[in-house]
Amino acid sequence: MFDVLMYLFETYIHTEAELRVDQDKLEQDLTDAGFDREDIYNALLWLEKLADYQEGLTEPMQLASDPLSMRIYTPEECERLDASCRGFLLFLEQIQVLNLEIREMVIERVLALDTAEFDLEDLKWVILMVLFNIPGCENAYQQMEELLFEVNEGMLH
């Protein structure tokens, strides 16, 4: 499922291709690209739920922003988000790329992924997808994009 999301993000969203694609055609394109129908369905459902935030159909959790408070992760969240992922989320909050509500959206979308393995690189892409879908987060999206691609470009040398 995550492979389908990455493919969709890189092919349709990140490249600013035509965003209004017929769902049947999209499903056929993904099937032709070799993706499993169940993964396609789950990825499209994941994106629909993410779009619900943008359309205001789903409200993010309202949290008090006490600077001394700390997020305690549930065992399920710790199982999916290892220490490096949780540390990265905290880092993004500290540099104000994420606020508390968007952090919770990211965590919710991570937990909704149907994937056995999940690492820091995957988290960065999920964050980028979430920020892309939230109006008014263009600067945060750009900062996150720079963080993602700076690190990856540095690894190529």
UniProtKB/Swiss-Prot annotation:
InterPro entries the UniProt entry points to: Smg (IPR007456)
Pfam families: DUF494 (PF04361)
Similarity comment: family membership: Belongs to the Smg family.
Name of this chain's protein: Protein Smg
